[in-house]
Amino acid sequence: MLKLLSEFVLTGQTPHIVLPIGSFNTNISPFVKLARTFSESKKFENFLEKYEKNEYYDDVSVLISEWANGGDFLDYIKENYKTMKLKEWRVIFFQILSVLAVIQKKYPAFRHNDLKPNNILVQVSEVNNKTLKFRYVINGHEYYVPNIGVQIKLWDFDFACIPGIIENSKVDADWTDKINIKPEQNRYYDVHYFFNTFTRKGFFNNFWILDEVPKEVKEFVRRVVPLKYSEGKNVSERGRILHNKEFVRPDILLEHDVFFEKMRPKK
């Protein structure tokens, strides 16, 4: 999947996808030894626990990818939300929606299926020119996006699929079907899952009550995920939408929602 999607970066359609560098197959033993030298890391602890329970194969496939120096989106927000202005929120949300819109234009049935905040990486750079704006063309529409020194990149496509092009056995299991992780077109699914998990317990659950989060940001998120789709019969326990009605699409939000009005050229 990552190799296929990298075409959008290489052709200049979006910079917001992690690029693969290479992959190889090897025995898992060297990684177990490496993990044991980082005993204070929770991620490595979890890795070792699963290894001890024989949850991994002896031979594994290793992917080397582009590095993102800002960690994942969830950690970035938790560390920076107190100083983030409306502009920063708008640009970051634009980047997330724009890359989905670009992918869905060519592959309408594409689903990431696990677009939670910690599956989005962040690249941070110094802002040398505060007046600089980047020109995006998304499905024939122009947008001018301020340079905030932050660039997001989609990552972790383990559950992603494009029916008929890239199949994924993980989305054909009974347990995934029950929570609507399936190879069925729904251009709202990834949008919903990102915003709904972002504001839930275990992620950034104080989002709705924090004074530091601008009200325009909260209002936008509520328009994307209204209450009826944030919990209840339409949503799984962990926040996944349980139907495949396309309530709204990324491109529609960019083209028509007032939140992105400043990025659209004046007519």
Regions found by a protein language model. Give the residues of each.
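Structural motif at the C-terminus of the N-lobe alphaC helix and the adjacent alphaC-beta4 loop
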Residues: 1-17
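E2/UBC-UEV (E2-variant) core
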Residues: 3-8, 48-51, 55, 73-76, ...
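Conserved kinase catalytic-core helix
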Residues: 5-6, 80-112, 117, 126-127
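Core residues of folded domains in eukaryotic genome-function proteins
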Residues: 14-19, 59-63, 94, 106-118, ...
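Conserved structural core of kinase catalytic domains
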Residues: 15-87
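Conserved beta-strand elements of beta-rich interaction domains across eukaryotes
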Residues: 25-27, 68-72, 127, 159-160, ...
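Catalytic activation segment of kinase domains across protein kinase-like and atypical kinase folds
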Residues: 109-187
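Helical subdomain adjoining the active site within ATP-dependent kinase catalytic cores
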Residues: 178-267
